[in-house]
């Protein structure tokens, strides 16, 4: 046809090559066809792919190279020769169509097609009409592929680009012979066949799948040249973000490709973004992508816009109290709201929430964190002076905004107005019993744990009381439980009473463990293990065998060796609701903070570090639950909340201890 060279086709699979050389003994090597790609892709495979590409480019002008499909059954001898390494090149091949069909067959026989994991996402991304955003999404998807898949894909994309150019050049050279249709068919056939071999397609999405391949081919030179702006790692079989630029990080919050299976990703960014950016910059990016969404086709515009607004509202709700005091953030938000004069009906809910930032603070808010149970405590709220000043600034920013000053808002934040209990009420903890006392201790500890916002565990905020008041409240209570334990024992002058008291507190620690309150249990064990108590040999000797065994088990549980291994193993295996030992979280968080940089060597945001931080926050939040069903006894609870009033000073413990059991008496 035309000036194209006519090639006589062999119907018997006519790649003969060195197979015709008789008397050659060879050992068949490991197959490359139908074998899953591995990280250590074999040199044989890469050699085969490279030689196939070189050969096909040399024969790109051959009529029917890709438009003629050779049946798989006729390729058997070709594949056997390749597998047996009898074919070292294709110089003796009598039909290039066999090389082309075998090349495509290799990809279609992979257990998992080269683009199978991102096929649906690629198809969806093609529908994005904003060119820059679309190509960024596609590149991000390609980076999520395993390295071996990505490298092989790049080889083929480069081949398709060169093949298309060769066909076009040949078409221009032979335009007088009307070969345009032939060349167009060859290029289209190549795209069609590689699309089928690479992606999971259906008749309904095949055309758009081909378009996805074409877009990747058009971008391949730029993709190869640019530095990688997002990195992934595999967890539980799914690709999750390991590191990224700020732009790619924000794009992934919206996940417009519908294939990003990383349930903790948004939480990670929302809780840790201030390690590498500001609320103003994050809001700026969200607004930027919202404006892009407004330029998309009608089909995508509503869906994408709502996704972006949902992400924005989710982030703002988590940090509502903090953002309410960030005037730069409020200015940025106000500018955005003013730029959307007519809010679509489907977006009213989101914009109504955004407007709440410009209403005066009547009472400190207790916004719910995303897990639904962790509240900001009163110490994080503004002073009345700061609040008044802020409200005045906000009102100046308001334009025709109706402010509903509702003075009837019910405020239940740590109110003690109904507390008529006398702090000096006479409570006999020994008659009440260790189990009931343990319950009331647990109620107190649980309330204190729930009051700690996640922000107090980040940026080492826990190291400064001014930055973590609720955290330090619970630490102080932990120390108070320990001091109370030691003080109560030392307050008993009679040996018999000391033995009873010592037994009681061992039983109290045991009861706390049984209730899941490991924090108080560890505090009590610390009080029992205070050197002023541990030296009371006469007292310890009088303990019953059972009580001594209980104490030994408690010591083993809270043994410091191997980073609290026994304790960690126990809480890992328990399915019960617990109050964990608070002191380990700072230790774990400091290890993450100091052991990982915020940015990688190539200046990407180290998402892996922040994921580790959030995993600890997530664990803490899982404990911040209204866990316990037993009833509160206000007299006992109030007594326990105020036990520090009558305790001995720790500096006096040793002198009291020596008075109770002098060294001479212990040695007699």
UniProtKB/Swiss-Prot annotation:
PROSITE patterns linked: RASGEF_CAT, RASGEF_NTER, RHOGAP
Origin superkingdom: Eukaryota
Residue span(s) of domain Rho-GAP: 27-224
Family matches, as InterPro entries: Ras-like_GEF, Ras-like_Gua-exchang_fac_N, Ras_GEF_dom_sf, RASGEF_cat_dom, RASGEF_cat_dom_sf, Rho_GTPase_activation_prot, RhoGAP_dom
One GO term of the biological process aspect: response to differentiation-inducing factor 1
A molecular-function term among this protein's GO annotations: guanyl-nucleotide exchange factor activity
Domain N-terminal Ras-GEF: 237-362
GO CC entries: plasma membrane
Organism: Dictyostelium discoideum
Function: Promotes the exchange of Ras-bound GDP by GTP.
Gene: gefD
SUPFAM superfamilies linked: GTPase activation domain, GAP (SSF48350), Ras GEF (SSF48366)
Name of the protein this chain belongs to: Ras guanine nucleotide exchange factor D
UniProt entry tagged with the keyword Nucleus: no
Signal peptide region: none
Annotated positions for site Arginine finger: 67
Alphabetical keyword list: GTPase activation, Guanine-nucleotide releasing factor
SMART domains: RasGEF, RasGEFN, RhoGAP
Occurrences of domain Ras-GEF (ranges): 433-663
Keyword Nucleotide-binding found: no
């Amino acid at each position: 046809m035309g000036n194209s060279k006519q090639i006589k086709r062999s119907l018997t699979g006519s790649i003969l090559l060195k197979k015709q050389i008789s008397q050659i003994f060879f050992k068949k090597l490991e197959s490359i066809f139908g074998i899953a790609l591995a990280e250590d892709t074999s040199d044989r495979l890469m050699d085969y792919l490279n030689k196939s590409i070189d050969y096909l480019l040399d024969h790109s002008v051959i009529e029917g190279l890709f438009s003629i499909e050779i049946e798989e059954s006729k390729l058997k001898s070709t594949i056997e020769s390749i597998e047996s390494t009898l074919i070292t090149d294709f110089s003796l091949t009598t039909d290039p169509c066999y090389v082309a069909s075998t090349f495509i067959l290799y990809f279609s026989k992979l257990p998992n097609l080269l683009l199978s994991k991102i096929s649906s996402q690629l198809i969806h991304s093609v529908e994005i009409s904003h060119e820059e955003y679309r190509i960024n999404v596609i590149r991000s998807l390609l980076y999520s592929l395993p390295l071996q898949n990505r490298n092989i894909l790049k080889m083929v994309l480069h081949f398709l680009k060169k093949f298309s150019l060769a066909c076009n050049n040949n078409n221009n050279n032979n335009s007088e012979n009307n070969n345009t249709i032939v060349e167009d068919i060859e290029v289209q056939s190549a795209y069609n066949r590689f699309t089928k071999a690479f992606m999971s397609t259906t008749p309904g999405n095949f055309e758009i799948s081909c378009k996805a391949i074409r877009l990747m081919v058009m971008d391949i030179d730029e993709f190869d040249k640019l530095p990688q702006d997002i990195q992934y790692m595999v967890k539980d079989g799914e690709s999750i973000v390991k590191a990224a630029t700020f732009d790619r990080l924000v794009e992934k919050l919206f996940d417009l490709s519908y294939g990003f299976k990383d349930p903790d990703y948004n939480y990670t960014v929302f809780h840790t973004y201030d390690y590498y950016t500001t609320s103003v910059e994050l809001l700026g990016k969200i607004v930027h992508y919202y404006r892009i969404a407004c330029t998309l086709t009608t089909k995508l515009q509503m869906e994408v816009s709502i996704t972006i607004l949902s992400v924005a509202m989710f982030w703002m709700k988590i940090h509502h109290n903090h953002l309410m005091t960030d005037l730069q953030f409020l200015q940025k938000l106000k500018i955005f709201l003013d730029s959307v004069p007519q809010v679509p009906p489907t977006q009213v809910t989101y914009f109504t929430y955004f407007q709440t930032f410009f209403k005066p603070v009547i009472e400190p808010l207790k916004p719910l964190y995303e897990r639904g149970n962790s509240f900001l405590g009163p110490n994080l709220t503004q002073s009345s002076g700061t609040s008044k000043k802020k409200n005045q600034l906000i009102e100046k920013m308001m334009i025709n905004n109706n402010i509903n000053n509702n003075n009837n808002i019910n405020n239940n934040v740590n109110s003690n107005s109904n507390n008529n209990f006398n702090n000096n009420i006479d409570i006999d903890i020994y008659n009440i019993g260790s189990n009931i006392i343990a319950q009331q201790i647990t109620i107190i500890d649980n309330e204190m744990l729930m009051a700690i916002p996640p922000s107090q565990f980040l940026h080492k905020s826990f190291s400064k009381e001014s930055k973590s008041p609720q955290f330090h409240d619970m630490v102080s209570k932990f120390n108070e439980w320990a001091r109370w334990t030691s003080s109560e024992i030392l307050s008993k002058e009679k040996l018999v009473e000391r033995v009873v008291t010592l037994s009681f507190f061992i039983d109290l620690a045991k009861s706390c463990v049984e209730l899941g309150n490991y924090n108080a249990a560890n505090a009590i064990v610390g009080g029992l293990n205070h050197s002023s108590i541990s030296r009371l040999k006469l007292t310890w000797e009088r303990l019953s065998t059972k009580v001594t065994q209980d104490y030994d088990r408690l010591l083993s549980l809270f043994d410091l060796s191997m980073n609290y291994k026994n304790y960690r193993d126990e809480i890992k295996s328990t399915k019960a609701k617990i109050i964990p030992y608070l002191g380990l979280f700072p230790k774990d968080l400091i290890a993450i903070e100091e052991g990982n940089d915020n940015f990688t060597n190539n200046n990407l945001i180290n998402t892996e570090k922040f994921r580790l931080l959030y995993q600890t926050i997530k664990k803490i939040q899982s404990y911040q639950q209204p866990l316990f069903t037993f009833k509160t006894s206000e007299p006992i609870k109030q007594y326990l909340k105020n036990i520090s009033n009558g305790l001995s000073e720790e500096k006096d413990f040793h002198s009291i201890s020596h008075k109770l059991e002098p060294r001479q008496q212990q040695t007699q």
